[in-house]
Amino acid sequence: MFGFGQLIEILKKDPKKIVFTEGEDPRILEAASRLLASSFLHPILVGDPEKIAASAEKSGFNIRGAEIIDPMNFDRMDEMVELFCELRKSKGVTPEQARGILSSANYFGTMLVKMGIADSLLGGATYSTADTVRPALQLIKTKPGNTIVSSCFILVRPSATGENEVLAMSDCAINIHPTEDELVEIAGESAECAKIFGIDPKVAFLSYSTLGSGKGEDVDKMRNAAHKAKEKYPNLPIEGEIQFDAAVAPRVARTKCPQSEVAGHANTFIFPDINAGNIGYKIAQRLGNFEAYGPILLGLNAPINDLSRGCNAGEVHSMAIITAALA
């Protein structure tokens, strides 16, 4: 059963620092004030200290104890510039250019993670997804063995037993048309992410076909990806290609694929493309009354996550806990 309590317990045992790139935003300040009232997560706010203090005072949020770092007055800027130039040497970035780039809070905040000053980063309250993800790709980079960054949504709703029903859905936000091999990578990363939220992953590669009932290139892609994933992750329960009803409904599963250990019980869903994934998680959210947490970015060397520009302070607070717990 998933609850934020278990993530908070993880953080209490090993408190983390998280960077907020939009330190003056009232939603960020409200979330930071809530985090400061606890002892398991330490916020770092990027921006002008005077402007941040004024915004907090105007909004009535107590941010006493927050660490505020101003890119314009950072005592380790020379070190940051040198590292940035090394990371971007293939692009021929000069120190002067680096200083200009690092005046942007999204790049500056990402470098704080790269330098080990913070453990994770949460941005996107005012930045676009691209402006949050691009610095992460350039500076944090993907994990060894990974070729892409992908995303996962965690969906939660109370069940009839009183426990939470928890599902993982990928990739609903980043990769438009993932290849077979990219789908395999997405499945592995999503399964690992699911475990953090108390899910014992049973992975379904979704399609309009179940084990050969339909034909077409899209069917072949999901079937082949599922086969490759089974070979790569032999201890991970995987089925595919499979229709959604066969993946989640035991009665349908008994008819369509009675020998499958995943069919009827899947909880980690791999969509064929971003169209299906984005539509799918929003249907679950709006018609299925699931709370949706994400997108959680997967495949990076450190947790960097992106907020919706329409987020509220509660969503910032929740995503901060999720992001830090992944560190």
Where are these regions (language model features)?
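Anion-binding alpha/beta catalytic cores of soluble intermediary-metabolism enzymes, centered on
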Residues: 1-263, 268-327
